[in-house]
Amino acid sequence: MALHRSAGADSQSPVILIFDGEVWARHGLIGAVEQAVRAGDLAPVHLVLLDSGGRERRWRELDGTEPIHRYVAEALLPWLRAEHGLDPAPARTCAVGQSLGGLASLLCGLLAPRVVGAVVSQSASLWQEAPARALAELLERDGAQALADSRFVLEVGDQEWVLTGPHDDFARELRRSPARVEYLRYDGGHDYACWRGSLIPALVRLYPAD
């Protein structure tokens, strides 16, 4: 794990949890975030780049069978508070991921909304049923009132044929909840070029500079 603080970030500044953080470090995410902050577009943030640990560990931890939301809520965020003094409101804690990381981000937002109040999910592996199942249970229980203050940004490329249908279905069901939902489809595929191009704008929409 790596932690990067933007200039001007304080204990209440947004915390952005990035799955597959070591990959994003290679793709220049820190520099792109800093450029957006310096330009006055993005509020100062704390980037928490979570290492995937390799292919096998990534599949084991992010495929929806492990309770990743519990790790985030019960271990990671308390550690960031105790060791680094980061104590943002839930609305200022955002889980970000792509593919399996997108699936994990959705589970954090659905199952731990008291601490993770925002999600940016790009090309989530929604052929896995865990997010749809979790959302269905929330809707059946009480109309997913736990998501009343939550925000979700969902993105998928039109060339990701296996994912567009599940994303359409998931977005439709998520809009039955009180959460604020932004669903974007773009002409692209399952790759970092597409994801990077839309990630910074998504963060700016969630956390614009004052």
Regions found by a protein language model. Give the residues of each.
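Non-catalytic cap/lid and distal C-terminal segments of serine-dependent acyl enzymes
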Residues: M1-D210
